Amino acid sequence: MKLSKTFLFITALCCATPTLAIQNSTSSSGEQKMAMENTQNIREIYLAGGCFWGMEAYMERIHGVKDAISGYANGNTEKTSYQMIGLTDHAETVKVTYDANQISLDKLLKYYFKVIDPTSVNKQGNDRGRQYRTGIYYQDGADKAVIGQALAQLQTKYKKPVQIEVQPLKNYIVAEEYHQDYLKKNPNGYCHIDITKADEPVIDEKDYPKPSDAELKAKLTPLQYSVTQNKHTERSFSNEYWDNFQPGIYVDITTGEPVFSSNDKFESGCGWPSFTKPIIKDVVHYETDNSFNMQRTEVLSRAGNAHLGHVFDDGPKDKGGLRYCINSASIKFIPLAEMEKAGYGYLIQSIKK
């Protein structure tokens, strides 16, 4: 039987429609799953640290923080106000909403610790009273262990006992609109903390574990292994990064831990990459090197304990006077444009474009 063109068109359309519907349904389902996963990664923690104006503005500057709201927490009543918190025993508290894929609770707490006096009782900066006490209030029971470990590590840095209150969240009330985004509305308003400390990166050693020796031998080139593990030195002026001045970061070739920034790189004329300082002071350590009948200060990476190079006191005087002379074979350059994809998005704000 011969079929008409009209019949064939209608048949094709009918056959195609269910397939299209299935594709749309599948696409919609996938988008919903992604949205659900993204929502599941959004967490909340409540932080008290003196006047909430500064703490709110500080938290909002941190990579991975999605929102910060000023409020009152862990008082004795379900209602309060700015005028009443002295009577209801609420603490000025910032509700911090963050993406756990971008910043962990442990790292977020390290930022928090940078701007409080953890040994002070009912006092932060010039602010005094129970409403200005320090506190970490949680809703997820799993957060309690993370908070406990962070506080134990913090205590090792102080002789006095840490006085930060840790409790499940209760009686949280959002503060009056006047207090929300206060420092955005009043740029010269009162702030007891240096909010620019949020721009100083927190680099967690635990994120960059050291591979085994066998893994290093498989991963590194012979030159990279020789330099990082046996403290050898590559040739000057014929290495990869001595004349590279693109914006980005330099990471330990053995672990991936960030060690230097393009912000601090300069032309020293020595033929090796030269920096005025590490990206933060904690990512390197030093040993005395008496080899070749010289007394030098060796620079090693924190997580990988890899030999990076040496530091000398003939650097730019206006930038501290130091010159970190580093082997290209010990580091890997991550361009600014690739930092987010490579997992270093949290450092982008600290790199000058």
Swiss-Prot record:
It is an enzyme of class 1 (oxidoreductase). Keywords: Multifunctional enzyme, Oxidoreductase. Residues 43-196 are annotated as: Peptide methionine sulfoxide reductase A. Residues 213-336 form the MsrB domain. One of its GO terms (molecular function) is L-methionine:thioredoxin-disulfide S-oxidoreductase activity. It holds the Pfam family PMSR. The keyword Oxidoreductase applies. Its EC number is 1.8.4.11, 1.8.4.12. SUPFAM superfamilies: Mss4-like (SSF51316), Peptide methionine sulfoxide reductase (SSF55068). Gene3D superfamilies: Peptide methionine sulfoxide reductase, Peptide methionine sulphoxide reductase MsrA. The active site is at residues 51, 325. The keyword Glycoprotein does not apply. One of its GO terms (biological process) is response to oxidative stress. GO terms for cellular component: cytoplasm. This is Peptide methionine sulfoxide reductase MsrA/MsrB.
